[in-house]
Structures are given as structure tokens and as C-alpha cells.
């Protein structure tokens, strides 16, 4: 970092690290936000930071970057407000040119997808492939390991109900330090949390199961079905982050409790007709 001309980053750089005057830091962020960020958060249950401490971190980051890559007008508006860029006179730092990483979603071939499935060990399946990619929770943290996550899916129930029709690729958020043991569900649940390229998982899957993650914006480019399993919706909306979008506007069915029967119904609907 000390000798490079450009810094390309998709998260906030540590508060104590600053670019030199002749270095250019390009903030690419890591997705279009559904959940509120930075200065836009008004309710905040976080294990490590107060709301003022978080806003300070965004303020420090705003002082560092010269450019901020945005995929859309919607995202630009949210980035400007979340980093309070107008107050710092930096709203013109936004470059609204889309995410280069999404080009792969449009340029892939059947051979590319077959190669990905082979790498994942699912090349011979004729079942629907469901990518389950939940986000992390600000208020779930263990000081000994970091952020934790407890899956609120009854995989026993799902396997009995749709195991003959579907397999699940489970991708935990990179901040989550929890270890997951899916040995009991071998052949039904595949832990792909350590697989580096999430775009490959988008391409290999037939549908997305997520909650508040920004992955759905990128996945929408593929026009594949999506299910939003927001089992802790009330707490997330009222205590943790809240949202930029009314969930009724999301491009797929929304489940706002732990209703496994409803989740199974939506998975079966995908298996039967692939409705989007």
C-alpha cells in the first residue's frame, strides 16, 4: 500500500491508515444497500460501536477517498447521504458507472457454468440449486472470535420437504467467524462460505435465498427467482438498521418470521415453475 499509486477497496479502510498526497483511494464499496448505512442509521444495536462512533468512522473514510464507484442513481443517493458527502463538499466524488464485477454475469458461457459446478462438486445434479446467502447481524458478536451467526433455518424440515428436489449452497457473510457443521446434511447442504468468487455461485444456482444482503441487487441481473427470508424482520427494522426500501417492493416473496412451512412453499414454487 505504501508504494502503490491507487488504492482500490470495497470496504472502509482502518481508521488509522491514510493515503499519501500522491495516492488515489477509490472506494468501490461492496454492493447496493438495502439496509441503512453510516449517517442514515437512526436505530442501531451494535455490539462494538455506538451510532456516533460509527458515523465517525464513515466521516474518516469520506476524508480519505477521492472517488466513490456507484452502480446506479439509487445507490449514488444513498452513498452520498450515508457518508454525509454534501456536508464535506465531496458529492462529486461519486462515479456512477456500474460494478465491473457484474460484467461476468452477462458474459459467462454454458462451459463456464459447467466448470463452476464441477469445482463445487454438483455437476451431476438435476436438482434445483438454491444459494442461501444471509448477511451478518450487528448485534451478534463473541469477543473471543468475532461476529457470529446462527442459522434460523430448520434444515431437517427442509430436507424432508424438498431434499429430493433441491440442494442448498450456504454462503455465510465474510464477517461471520462462526463455524458451520453441515455433515449431517451431506448431499443436501454444501458450505461454500470459503469459495472466493460469489459471482460463480450466482451463476451456478437456480435461485437465491437471502435476507437483508445487498447480494440480491447483483443477483437480479440474472433474472432468476429470489426469496427473502427475514426471520428477524421486526428487530432488524426497529432496533438494528432499518432499510432504504419498503420490503414490499422487493423482487420476490418476503417471509418475516420463522415460518418454515411458508419457506418450503416458496421453494416448491421455484421448483415447479421458477416464478420470478
Regions found by a protein language model. Give the residues of each.
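A nucleotide-sugar donor-handling region in carbohydrate enzymes
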Residues: 38-44, 50-142, 276
Amino acid at each position: 500500500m505504501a508504494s502503490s499509486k491507487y488504492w482500490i477497496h470495497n470496504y472502509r479502510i482502518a481508521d488509522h491508515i491514510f493515503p499519501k498526497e500522491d495516492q488515489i483511494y477509490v472506494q468501490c464499496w461492496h454492493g447496493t444497500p438495502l439496509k441503512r448505512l453510516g449517517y442514515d442509521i437512526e436505530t442501531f444495536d451494535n455490539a462494538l460501536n455506538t451510532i456516533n462512533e460509527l458515523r465517525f468512522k464513515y466521516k474518516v473514510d469520506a476524508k480519505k477517498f477521492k472517488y466513490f464507484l456507484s452502480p446506479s442513481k439509487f445507490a449514488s443517493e444513498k452513498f452520498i447521504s450515508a457518508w454525509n458527502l454534501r456536508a464535506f463538499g465531496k458529492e462529486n466524488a461519486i462515479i456512477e458507472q456500474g460494478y465491473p464485477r457484474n460484467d461476468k454475469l452477462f458474459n459467462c458461457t454454458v462451459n463456464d457454468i459447467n466448470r463452476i459446478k464441477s469445482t463445487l462438486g454438483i455437476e451431476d445434479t438435476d436438482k434445483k440449486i438454491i444459494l442461501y446467502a444471509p448477511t451478518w447481524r450487528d448485534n451478534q458478536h463473541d469477543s473471543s472470535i468475532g461476529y457470529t451467526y446462527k442459522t434460523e433455518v430448520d434444515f431437517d424440515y427442509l430436507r424432508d420437504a424438498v431434499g429430493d428436489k433441491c440442494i442448498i449452497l450456504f454462503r455465510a457473510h465474510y464477517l461471520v467467524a462462526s463455524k458451520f457443521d453441515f455433515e449431517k446434511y451431506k448431499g443436501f447442504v454444501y458450505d461454500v462460505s470459503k469459495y472466493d468468487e460469489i459471482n460463480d455461485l450466482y451463476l451456478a444456482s437456480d435461485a437465491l435465498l437471502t435476507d437483508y444482503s445487498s447480494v440480491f441487487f447483483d443477483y437480479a441481473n440474472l433474472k432468476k427467482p429470489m426469496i427473502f427470508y427475514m426471520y428477524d424482520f421486526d428487530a432488524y427494522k426497529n432496533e438494528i438498521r432499518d432499510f432504504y426500501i419498503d420490503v414490499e417492493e422487493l423482487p420476490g416473496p418476503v417471509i418475516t418470521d420463522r415460518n418454515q412451512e411458508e419457506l418450503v412453499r416458496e421453494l416448491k414454487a421455484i421448483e415447479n415453475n421458477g416464478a420470478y
